């Protein structure tokens, strides 16, 4: 899918188990010209990511069945995915959490609730960086 300026639209994988948050993230990103691939179950995230070849991965850290941190670490070891920056989002932003998330390999971090302004600023910074 091409944007109006002729460039290919950036592809963003959204891994979020909360249906409302996942839809909100995808709707906001689509409204800004991005192509999104929503993933509700973290167990499917790596396979979907490999098939989708995202320019950016937005990763919820608290997922049922698998840790978002484990998924980030696995993505960073994957030859196909390791170049894709990861923006981690979490509702549990305690002391030391950001360090653990960055140690896992995430290039960006936002605490929930996520506002649209900071989300878009982080997305653009990671895609342009």
Where are these regions (language model features)?
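Charged docking surfaces used in two-component/phosphorelay signaling
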Residues: 23-31
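C-terminal output helix
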Residues: 26, 114-123
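Short hydrophobic/Thr-rich beta-strand motif most characteristic of the beta2 strand and flanking loop
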Residues: 33-40, 48, 110
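Active-site beta3 strand of CheY-like receiver
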Residues: 52-58, 63
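The feature encodes the CheY-like receiver
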Residues: 64, 73, 82, 94
